[in-house]
Amino acid sequence: MTTQLDSLRNMTVVVADTGDIDAIKKYQPQDATTNPSLILSASALPQYAPLIDEAVAYAKAQSADKAQQLIDAEDKLAVNIGLEILKIVPGRISTEVDARLSYDTQATVEKARKLIALYNAAGISNDRILIKIASTWQGIRAAEILEKEGINCNLTLLFSEAQARACAEAGVYLISPFVGRILDWYKANSDKKEYAPAEDPGVISVTKIYNYYKEYGYNTVVMGASFRNVGEITELAGCDRLTIAPALLKELQENSTALVRKLEYKGEVKAKPQPLTEAEFYWQHNSDAMAVEKLAEGIRKFAIDQEKLETMLSAKL
């Protein structure tokens, strides 16, 4: 029996959106993505206790300063979890930069270099890592610098066409346009509460971005993210990559209904437009209330979970 997950794998690279190693073993994705919220929830699992202890011991050996120890411990824990995941997935792990650095280009670059150095010290080459950065103007500029250094980036919390365009123009390796959070916003801010998959505003957004990239010949990978239901996933079958939570991977694995490819650009490739200026980026991005609100909210939520992680680690330092 061919499952929908099998069919999806034939047209899209399937990525697991989790830090749960047992789930990754079960669904055998090509890559895995983590974020501060997923690191926080993974840290509560008993099998991660040794990774936390090792990160704390590492931090204590690096510095006597408590504030520095905390920074080192959280960076090392994120990498430790990534290292465990890389024992299972054949492809890449996405590890996220502290969301509180989202508006600081230089600090983002420095944090990314540090995370890469920790992976390199553990014997992992750059081609197995993606550094996740929020798709702010400052984050996109940081990614532009990092890509030139051979550090590939995954630009996340992407909600607007302006963000997508700026990422492609910066030569970013991969973007993660969010689907479910866009749907959440439209449900909360309009009278319409139910959407068929084909009319889901998150699905429409990713479809537009995918077609724009193919139309202008951008090499940046489009990886749809943040799904609320299987319908959103099947409606994006054919997207370069899709990062999917274990509960939805399970649904796809248990369903054998035929899957039809939905995304496939067959038109001509056009000459690329002039890159957006900073002023144009902000005007276009800020013209989309949903994108403005969801980007800011996403950064706040990741920062809150980063702080919860710090509270947990502080008790051990």
Swiss-Prot record:
HAMAP family: Transaldolase_1. Keywords: Cytoplasm, Pentose shunt, Schiff base, Transferase. Disulfide bonds: none annotated. The active site is at 132 (schiff-base intermediate with substrate). This is Transaldolase. SUPFAM superfamilies: Aldolase. NCBIfam families: PRK12346.1, talAB. Its EC number is 2.2.1.2. GO terms for biological process: carbohydrate metabolic process; pentose-phosphate shunt, non-oxidative branch. The keyword Heme does not apply. Transaldolase is important for the balance of metabolites in the pentose-phosphate pathway. The keyword Transferase applies. Pathway: Carbohydrate degradation; pentose phosphate pathway; D-glyceraldehyde 3-phosphate and beta-D-fructose 6-phosphate from D-ribose 5-phosphate and D-xylulose 5-phosphate (non-oxidative stage): step 2/3. Gene3D superfamilies: Aldolase class I (3.20.20.70). Pfam families: TAL_FSA. It is an enzyme of class 2 (transferase). It catalyses: D-sedoheptulose 7-phosphate + D-glyceraldehyde 3-phosphate = D-erythrose 4-phosphate + beta-D-fructose 6-phosphate. Belongs to the transaldolase family. Type 1 subfamily. It is found in: Cytoplasm. One of its GO terms (cellular component) is cytosol. GO terms for molecular function: transaldolase activity.
